[in-house]
Amino acid sequence: MTDEQERVQPSGVWATAVGVARVRALETERENALFRDPLAQAFATAGGLWPSSPPLPDDEAARRRRLTVSFSIVIRTKFLDDLLQQASASGVRQVVLLGAGMDSRAFRMDWPEGTRLFEVDTAAPLDFKASVLRQERADARCERITVAVDLREDWPGALAAVGHDPAVPTVWIAEGLLIYLPEDAVELLLARISAQSAAGSRMGLTLGSRGVIERFGADAAPGSAASMWVSEMPDDPVGWLAGHGWEADSHTLRERAAAYGRPISTPPQREERPGGLISAVRR
């Protein structure tokens, strides 16, 4: 039986990772792409989202919201790519992707010799991903280690068991993850990250902006990403992270989009609050 025949199709929260892959595949096709993800189309195809996908809603407001989510995925991907490159340039050689989904950075980015990249996720998405990687004959550009564990369980122990060393700096990435976790789970996750982080560690987070659940969740289709969002960012994300021992900067989507040459033409609908694109350093 082939990988394609054995492959378990995406469902639940992790199915949203295939939708993210579709967005990255579309960006990759652009002449002025902010990044290139050669594996994204294969992930989207395997998940049934390429070349076709669910049509945009008829309602104009709902259509704009869908396009906004796709745009935010492109900008956050570029933001975290840059953060990872900066961390590598500073000498960090351990990378942990929490809720890794269909992330292909181990395959599409250039890594310094000695880099170890840990992908933490549950078994189902990791197995799905592995079957696509075999099909594509993909070779990682660094030492890639998968860690099949639920983030509600003892993932630090599972990470240590495969060689993560908390005594040396790590760069942690939680991309498109925290918005799916209740606030107490977010606090526990951050406490666990902090406990495994030596001085000089880096962290990149994406947080749901204040009010995003109300704006996007009201008419979200069952099973859609927005229908599963449960938490938003604190009013003061920089202060929140300082309380956990991190020196952080927050950036808005609008700010980063302009910096990347993709300015948002429409004026903000409300007063700009602290942004949900977070970079942080462990002191």
Swiss-Prot record:
| Keyword Lyase recorded | no
Task: Tell me which residues bind S-adenosyl-L-methionine.
Answer: 121, 150-151
InterPro entries xrefs: Ppm1/Ppm2/Tcmp, SAM-dependent_MTases_sf, SAM_mthyl_Trfase_ML2640-like
Record keywords: Transferase included? Answer: yes
Domain of life from the UniProt record? Bacteria
A GO term, aspect molecular function: methyltransferase activity
Q: Which UniProt keywords apply?
A: Methyltransferase, S-adenosyl-L-methionine, Transferase
Gene3D superfamilies with a match to the protein in the record: Vaccinia Virus protein VP39 (3.40.50.150)
Annotated region described as Disordered, given as residue ranges: 258-283
The main enzyme category here is transferase
Fetch the Pfam families from UniProt: LCM
Quote the EC number: 2.1.1.-
**GO:BP terms for this protein?**
methylation
Protein task: Exhibits S-adenosyl-L-methionine-dependent methyltransferase activity.
Protein family according to the UniProt entry? Belongs to the UPF0677 family.
* Name this protein carries in UniProt: Putative S-adenosyl-L-methionine-dependent methyltransferase SAV_474/SAV474
